[in-house]
Amino acid sequence: VEIPVAESLGVSRTPVRLAFRALEQEGLLEKAGKRGYVVRRFSEADVRSAIEVRGTLEGLAARHLAERGMTDAVRETLAGCIAEGAAVLAKGFLVDEDIGRWGRLNKRFHDALVDAQDSRVIADAIARNNHLPFASADSLALDRAALPSEYQKLRIAQLQHQLVFDALTQRESARVE
């Protein structure tokens, strides 16, 4: 596997081998005996677990942030994301462009929360987990054919963002977690 990849990229086997090892450590590739690597299969349960792990780690990050307190810049970023989310939902329905917009604002919200807390260990664990399929905050599994029901999901997510922001503002660490 290394040789064809190296040839197609015009590089030696060494960087390809190192990249494959890194992808294996991230859980995206698995060793296939002496034949190299195969792409790891992920079940629906794996995806659910990865999302649950992200939620738990982000809850811990939010607790740390609530205990320490938010800077004005973090407060403004989170409030801006909430305002943008409200604007997306204000018309009472979704269009295709709203999905990408929501994904970007959701990523900004979650990234701001994680970046502002004080634990590099938590941030690193979240970053590793985010490499798994559909685990990151910008991975939205929305059904474009059922936008009315997806609208309701985003309304709930918007409410959750508001509740997290309120708890952070009031420095209620147990509530935010």
What are these regions (language model features)?
Residues 28, 69, 93, 172-173:
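Residue-level recognition of short, well-ordered coil/turn positions
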Residues 51-54, 102-106, 154:
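Amphipathic, non-transmembrane alpha-helical scaffold segments
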Residues 72-143, 160-163, 175-177:
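Conserved amphipathic alpha-helical segments that form helical-bundle/coiled-coil interaction surfaces
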Residues 55, 79, 155-159:
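Amphipathic alpha-helical repeat elements characteristic of tetratricopeptide repeat
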Residues 49, 63, 115, 165-166:
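Surface-exposed charged/polar residues within alpha-helices that form helix-capping/stabilizing sites
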Residues 44-48, 66-72, 92-97, 144-153:
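A ubiquitous short alpha-helical element
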Residues 146-177:
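C-terminal regulatory/effector modules of DNA-binding transcriptional regulators
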Residues 1-68, 73, 121:
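Short linear motifs at protein or domain termini
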